Amino acid sequence: MLSPNDKKLEKLDPFYLPSLSKQKTSAEIVSEARNALRTVRTQRPFTPREDQRKLFGPASSRTPENRPPSSFSVHASSFEFSDSRPISGTRLSPLEFKPKAPASPDTVEDFCLSFPKPPVDPAKIRRISSARARLFRVASQGALLPARTLLPTQPTRVESEETVTTRDSVVKINGIYLTESKAIGHLKRHPLQLTYDGDFSKITEQEMFKGATSVPFHLRSGGDQGKRRPRASSSSRSPDQSRLDIRAGSKADLQEKNTEIEVDEVFWNTRIVPILHDLEKEENIEMVCATCTQLHHALEEGNMLGNKFKRRSVLLKTLYKLVDVGSDLLSLKLAKIILALKVSGKNLLNVCKLIFKISRSEKNDSLIRNDSILESLLEVLRSEDLQANTEAFLYCMGTIKFISGNPEFLHEMMGKGAVEILMSLIKQVNENTKKSGTCLPNSGHLLVQMTATLRNLVDSPLARSKLLSINALPQLCTVMEQHIGDKDVCTNIARIFSKLTSYHDCCVALASYSRCYALFLNLINKYQKKQDLVVRVVFILGNLTAKNNQAREQFSKEKGSIPTLLSLFHTFYKLDLHSGKRWGEGDERPEARRPAQAEDVLIKLTRVLANLAIHPGVGPAIAAHSHIVGLLLATLESKSIDDCEELVINTTATINNLSYYKVKNSIIQDRKLYIAELLLKLLVSNNMDGILEAVRVFGNLSQDHDICDFIVQKNVHKFMIALLDAKHQDICFSACGVLLNLTVDRDKRLILKEGGGIKKLVDCLRDFGPTDWQLASLVCKTLWNFSENITNAASCFGDEAANTLLALLSSFLDEELALNGSFDQDLKNYHKLHWETEFRPVAQQLLNRIKNHHTFLEPLPIPSF
């Protein structure tokens, strides 16, 4: 006899998919999403690698006459010598120079030192550099050096009788004459002396002033050099005295400057001139390159880099002449020094062109890396004026673009701040464009190079992190808005976003920028037939709408969003119909092929539609849109799974999501039988992904009585029962959902006994129950519907199945046993949620029903007579 509770259970309606009007738990929402609504994945559009390194690739929208050249010649004559002069208030006369060491003091200018032979020892040179620094300090403290005369050809040390402070007594330090009073102050601060051969000696004041020489006539300025004038107090100074102090200060500044110049002359003649002499006479390229490296180090040590060095013009002329040698390695060495000397204008352009020309050959990447040319190029971008050097920046960025495609440079570029530098330039271009109200000349060409470089860099996780930290994505959107007429720029940024939105954090960042949706729609409308750009924009939209319901809503609310997608769908559906050869029956199909261009757009587009359909406010509208549904069905009709697997699967997934909505004006519901006919092709294919999508659609459609009749008439139910043996959880889940809907109709419950359906359901419960409580719940609901009119458990399910069900259900309803899996805490919570809300209620009801209609008495043996 049934208990009151059991009688209530007996009157329950058959288990069915939850009603839309019912308030759903979170578990039900997850369950429904698994049943009916799901996002669609796809691959990022394929970008072929360019065979040649050029400013603009073969797919560029720029015509040859409307873009800067990638091929050109750079010679010594290309450079301007006028730029070689140092920046100063005085215009300097050109210097004639031959990189040959002077033979004697008579052959050089009167202010130059003769350089000693042999060349100075490197250890001594380092000491010279230290002495130069001390000399600067002396000058700043008032021990100013007057002009000097030519020095003796051999280094000498002044040693004679003790110093006596007289009018004409002087001391020579580092080849420069000083009065004794100044020299004493110098020695107190700096006990080291630099002799002419670059050596230092420890000396005392007494040694220093033994045998003071006479000041040459041209150094004498009158007055007692050994006496100091008492300094008047500030309170007693007269205006005349103040003017005298100012003049004295100006004179001191001039003397300090002269001192620096003379110290530079010492370094120039002892270090630089011998190297230039070697450059002139050396014929071996490797030795010339080594000498260039030596020259760069010497210039750096002597603080002679930059654009203010007096001898810069002589140096640059020598370097320019060596460009004609034509060696790539030598040219890179020269370019690095020239850039370090801060050339400008045409010379900056030519040196950037020179490096660009070398970088076009991939085999030179190792040379560029070994010489750290990247650092010099980034310094150009960081320090030079963008508007004044746009063309130079163009070729500089061209080189950086080339090497950014080499993974070996990725770490170096990240470490040297390449991402930040590029985004700073892009922001500057945006601001200049906004300020002027129009795109500046050549800015588009430059943006192509910068965005192509960023496209290569975003493969690095560090680059993506930096872009997010500096809020770079809105800046890139602004570039697209301002240069929407430049297809090359827009395509590069679309490629950047294609990569970035494949990562969740970047996808969220772009989705939160509300202006991006209208921008992407404008791009689709403007470049509707430009497949390489459109396919990426649609791919980006698919990423944005994949897991973000707010993005789905925001995009759908943009003016013309659905009509734009419809127009694009229609355009590429027509293109696909008329493109390429259709495979005939006798044709041998390749095992795998890349989708055609039109197919690829359709793949990405159907994915966007499938994702949008998940939103409850958008899905019903699309399901009621006759043109969109018509194109989906036409695609499914014209394509087989062998023609284009991804397109067929995505189209079926979109139909599945749309079939979830039971609205009056749904085109899906109106044409459900036609859709069921189309799905039969997928069910009999050998593609398990295609079969799974078809079964999912049948899971939604089979809630309709007409579809249930169709399933039985076409023997689709037998196929569903067979799929229970697939040992694939998702396939078993979807097939069980169809069988559950069939058992709602009392007339169709007996079909579960065909093909061993009951046993297979019990096997699914045993195999997948402990790891998939949603699937276990579906199995129990199906068996509950099937056993509504049960009188005996053994006759209803069969003896073996009934006993197995009793054992399984009793075990699975024991919480300790059921949830004792080796899962992490999050997964345990997930399993417990579904076990408590979905499995336990129906499993307990089914167990009670079986117990109440099951006898545990064993049959007696038949007596023998």
From Swiss-Prot:
InterPro entries: ARM-like, ARM-type_fold, Armadillo, ARMC2
A single GO BP: sperm axoneme assembly
Composition-biased stretches (Polar residues): 60-75
Entry's transmembrane regions: none
Renumbered residue ranges of the record's region Disordered: 39-75, 214-243
Keyword hit for Repeat: yes
Residue windows of the ARM repeats: 261-300, 303-343, 362-402, 407-448, 461-502, 505-546, 550-587, 589-614, 617-660, 662-703, 705-744, 746-788
Keywords from the named record: Differentiation, Repeat, Spermatogenesis
Functional description taken from the UniProt entry: Required for sperm flagellum axoneme organization and function. Involved in axonemal central pair complex assembly and/or stability.
Designated name of the protein: Armadillo repeat-containing protein 2
Organism: Bos taurus
